Structures are given as C-alpha cells and as structure tokens.
Amino acid sequence: MRIVLTGGSGYIGSSLTPVLIKKYGRVYNIGRNTISEVSINGSKEYCEFTYESLFDSLVELSPDLVINLAAGYYNDSGAPDLNVIDGNLKIPFIILEYFKSCNYGRFINIGSYWEFSCSGRGVKGVNPYGIIKSTVRRLLDYYSKYNVIYTNLILYGSYGDNDHRGKIVDCIIDAVNSNETLKLSPGEQKLNLVYIDDIIEAILYIVSSDNGQYDNETLSIYTPTEHTVKEIVCFINEIKDNNLSLGGGRYRNDEVMAPDYKYRNIFHAKDKLKEYITSKIKK
C-alpha cells in the first residue's frame, strides 16, 4: 500500500511516520512545496510542487491512501498567514480531486472539535481555522459519491513527549520547572487531552482496517475525563511550589470553554494526564 501524508513533519505526523515505515516500508510526505520520500534510510526529496502541479505529482505517485494531518493554525495578531487556507483546504481539495479522477481512493482526515464548537463570542467553528476545517467534512461527503472512501477522525487535544507546539500543559510545566511566573486565565475552560501514543494507535487501527467498518464515517477519540486548567494548576500545586498565577491573564478571544462530543469514540483512551505531568515536573 502506497501511503501519502500531509503534515507529516508536525507533532502527530512525526510520531506516526516511524510506525508506518516499520509496517509499510516507506511513506511520502507533502510539505509546503516539496514531497519527501521517507523510509528507514531517512528522508529524501521526491519532488518539488506548486498548487498547480500537485495534481500531476499525485498522478505520478499514485497513492492508495492519504492521511491528512496538515493543520495551518490561525493567528489573529499580525499579518494573516494564508497557510490557514492552503494547508487546511487547498491541499486536501487537490488530493480529493485526484482521487475523484481515479474513481477510487482512501482518505483519512484528522479533524478538530473546534469545527463544531462555539467560541465565547458564539461563533460556530470558533475561528477561521475551525471554520475552514469544517469545510473539509462537507467536501468528504461530496467526494464519497465518487468512490472516495473517507474516515474523518476528530481530535480533542493531544500531548506527550517531544511536543514543542507550545500547548497549555507544556507551557505550565516549563514555567514550573524554570520557576518562571506564568499568568493564566481564571482556568475554568475544560480540556479533554489524549496521550500521543493512543492517537497513533487509533490512526493505525483505521489504516489497517479492511472490512469497511469505518468507511465514510466521522469518528472521534477522547478520554472519559475532562480537566479544567484550574484543576491542572491545583494538581501541580500539590507536587511543587510554583509561580503560576490563575486569573492573572485573560481568556483568549476565541476561547472554547467546554468540549462538545458529537461523534462515536473509536478508541476509549485512558486519562494519563496526571501521570504525564508528574513525570515531567522536576522535584
């Protein structure tokens, strides 16, 4: 099976790629302007591409499966980053058009619960990132009528070793370990965070399924436990003295205060957050 990834150099992609290589030998990763071939021998450039030439590159690659991990995040400060459109919509659209032309293909899309959540301002989709990601769900339904088989996996949050994305849990841990002051919001927002290894296992489960049980379906992965930021801080307070300041900062303009669970949970992951935090806090 020839597998192509988008966003393979991101946090989830870099964790998934070695596991796929071990099982399938090699994968191809679509970056911002190059496609790389990745195997046990390392990574090498397969070709450069533009949005106009990507379709032809896919014809040459002839993938059986594409796993769409690309995520162009929205930043509401400074000049707009068009990758929020390019990564989240343009590349998936071109791939789906390619599969439509073949009258076959399998597409695993990694989505976000922000797509159907509401921000504190009452905006469904939260911000341009979530709104654009939600468009892909509607596209998947369209292309399924042209023999493109999709599985859409909704994530609620991820964490784990070697995560350099600056997510809230790691920001808190870094501040505690460096004895820095960190001003946080009042911390009432609820999080449902899944350990990276469980997410990878769930994706592999979908990749290796061959009985059609996940065909043309949107699924999700989450744990049975929600944690507020306030609860996380209180837990850390029991472990180590720190300079975390709850209420010293404000909620984000597009804050989501609680997860909304709309789709079947494919993988009943255990809540491992406290164990992870305990292992990372320097005593």
From Swiss-Prot:
One of its GO terms (biological process) is O antigen biosynthetic process. It catalyses: CDP-alpha-D-abequose + NADP(+) = CDP-4-dehydro-3,6-dideoxy-alpha-D-glucose + NADPH + H(+). The active site is at residue 129. This is CDP-abequose synthase. PANTHER family: BIFUNCTIONAL POLYMYXIN RESISTANCE PROTEIN ARNA (PTHR43245), UDP-D-APIOSE_UDP-D-XYLOSE SYNTHASE 2 (PTHR43245:SF13). NAD(+) binds at residues 7-13, 48-49, 129, 133. Keywords: Lipopolysaccharide biosynthesis, NADP, Oxidoreductase. One of its GO terms (molecular function) is oxidoreductase activity. It comes from the Bacteria. Belongs to the NAD(P)-dependent epimerase/dehydratase family. It is an enzyme of class 1 (oxidoreductase). Its EC number is 1.1.1.341. Signal peptide: none annotated. Pathway: Bacterial outer membrane biogenesis; LPS O-antigen biosynthesis. Coiled coil: none annotated. Pfam families: Epimerase. The CDP-abequose synthase is involved in lipopolysaccharides (LPS) synthesis containing abequose which are important antigens of the cell surface responsible for the serological O specificity. Derivatives of the 3,6-dideoxyhexose group have a particular highly immunogenic character. Transmembrane segments: none annotated.
